[in-house]
């Protein structure tokens, strides 16, 4: 039989492990294009991404509020000490599988799926916050890649119009410098959205265990989540960088600038609205959009099929693992 305080420590550690895998998996999105175009070395890019993720993570808590209370109803799950741990097991499992195979699926989808599966296992459909999950979670997750695709097209068209008289080598020299700024904006927006998701999960656990009385993200939660994500970026992001930066479309600095700027705008706006979106979906869609403006054959559309399968499977797969994990933990710990 587990003591409740020990279980809370385990949950917080599991959440930070998820954040670490998120850094290894999703934070590569912030630096994939700037590394693949050789504007920055991997070491410099990782350092920049880590610093700006830390800053971004401290800029708000709206996304954390949505993740903590917009998926599972706090009034229903408040008595379940194992729910958050089961959700994290589902998310971490799927993240690990897709990371191993170098597939840029969505950690956001994995976390949402894990929470949904564990909540359903605990109390059925009554545990799901139906009204909030549609408007603040499902629609943004669907619309953000569509917005990213068309923003990528629009950004590239505007750049082509503004610089059409400039020779490509000269333009690329300019955008090599500009891409440092766009990569920084992408890293900042990533911290604003993705780091807050784990903050929301940990804060929900603190609320369930009675460590806090109202849903408010403590400063130590913000800092530890930001640091865990930065460490994950440094350790494991390069498999995803290769897929994002080379396999989809052969990127030049101008393309990297357009894709990063477009993605940063979409993700930043979503963060200000408190919408947890997929940074993976968004930057990938931006790269597809940018590539499509050159010529359709320049984009390796075959990659899209593999990515689409992973994206479609992520929520149900992580929900299934989250639900099974809940029942296993319930049996092992004797808790609910």
Regions found by a protein language model. Name each.
Residues 1-336:
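Multi-pass alpha-helical transmembrane bundle typical of ion/small-solute transporters
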């Amino acid at each position: 039989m587990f003591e409740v305080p020990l279980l809370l420590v385990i949950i917080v550690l599991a959440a930070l492990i998820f954040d670490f895998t998120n850094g290894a998996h999703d934070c590569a999105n912030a630096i994939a294009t700037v590394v693949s175009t050789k504007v920055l070395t991997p070491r410099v890019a990782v350092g920049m991404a880590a610093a700006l993720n830390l800053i971004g993570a401290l800029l708000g808590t709206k996304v954390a509020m949505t993740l903590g209370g917009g998926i599972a109803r706090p009034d229903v799950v408040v008595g379940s000490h194992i729910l958050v741990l089961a959700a994290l097991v589902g998310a971490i499992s799927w993240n690990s599988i897709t990371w191993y195979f170098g597939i840029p699926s969505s950690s956001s989808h994995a976390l949402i799926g894990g929470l949904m599966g564990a909540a359903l296992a605990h109390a059925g459909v009554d545990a799901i916050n139906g009204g909030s999950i549609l408007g603040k979670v499902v629609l943004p997750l669907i619309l953000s890649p569509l917005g990213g695709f068309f923003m990528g097209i629009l950004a590239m068209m505007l750049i082509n119009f503004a610089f059409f008289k400039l020779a490509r080598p000269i333009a690329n020299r300019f955008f090599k410098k500009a891409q440092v700024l766009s990569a920084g904006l992408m890293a900042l927006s990533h911290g604003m959205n993705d780091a807050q998701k784990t903050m929301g999960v940990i804060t929900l656990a603190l609320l369930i265990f009675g460590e806090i009385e109202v849903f408010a993200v403590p400063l130590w939660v913000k800092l530890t989540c930001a640091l865990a994500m930065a460490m994950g970026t440094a350790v494991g992001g390069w498999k995803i960088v290769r897929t994002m930066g080379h396999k989809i479309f052969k990127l030049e600095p101008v393309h990297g600038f357009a894709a990063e700027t477009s993605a940063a705008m979409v993700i930043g706006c979503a963060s200000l609205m408190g919408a947890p979106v997929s940074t993976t979906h968004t930057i990938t869609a931006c790269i597809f959009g940018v590539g499509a403006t050159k010529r359709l054959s320049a984009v390796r559309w075959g990659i899209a099929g593999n990515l689409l399968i992973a994206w479609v499977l992520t929520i149900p797969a992580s929900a299934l693992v989250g639900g099974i994990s809940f029942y296993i933990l319930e049996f092992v710990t004797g808790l609910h």
